[in-house]
Amino acid sequence: MAAFAVVRRDTVEHMERKKKITLDPRLQKCADFVRCGVRVADVGTDHGYLPIALLQSGKAVSAVAADINAAPLESAVRNAARFGVSGRMRCVLSDGLAALSPQDADDVVVAGMGGELILRIISEADWLRAPEKHLVLQPMTTADRLRAGLYASGFAIDREDAVFDGKKIYSVLSVFFTGEAKTALPLRMLHMGCIRPGSPDSARYAASVLHHLENQRAGLRHAGGDTAALEAAIDEIRAAYRPEAE
């Protein structure tokens, strides 16, 4: 006769709390950029995996998980309980940072959105315009517009890495407010940001950018426009990042 082990529910829950969340490469790169010992806010938290991981690792002392939709936020609440961080993680229904205050976060992560939406969220939270606040941004699209908008608004990128998640290539930006607005960025800075040549996944990111710029160049040529600036940027990016070596 087969024997069955009976496992108490409280034992299972204890085992769950001891589990560590494993983040995908994109979110792990965001986690890597968060400073140690901070209060963190994750905007567009989805299932709450990032703030849970930051609390588990000890990088974050407290966390606010914010989302505009109730369903993913309910999932974040359940996951916080499941992994034993409910006492340090608050889940908030919020459009961007509208329901948060400066006391909620030292580091603010906005990941998994388009660059223009990220800019809107930042522009609507005046309290981010303080040098002690740190932004970790991961645009899914229009990273060039995000960089331009950040510099035009007095923010500066102090670090940027490319990250490949197995399917797509992204960038993650570390950003602080300086108050010094810049409205004209070189094309290489606009499209490659602060990604260092030779850094992991930089050549793959450059290949993606070059594909986009070459399409722009073809469109300009077809319309009879001046392609000189684009040509120079394409040549500079190709020489610096050597995407053909990827």
Describe each PLM feature range.
Residues 37-46:
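Conserved class I S-adenosyl-L-methionine
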Residues 48, 52:
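Glycine-rich SAM-binding Motif I of class I
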Residues 105-112:
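Short SAM/SAH-binding signature in class I
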Residues 21-37:
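Conserved alpha-helix/loop element of class I SAM-dependent methyltransferases that forms part
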Residues 16-25, 98, 104, 116-246:
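Class I S-adenosyl-L-methionine
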Residues 69-71:
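Conserved SAM/SAH-binding beta-strand->alpha-helix loop
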Residues 62-67:
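Conserved SAM-binding motif I beta-strand of class I
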Residues 74-103:
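S-adenosyl-L-methionine
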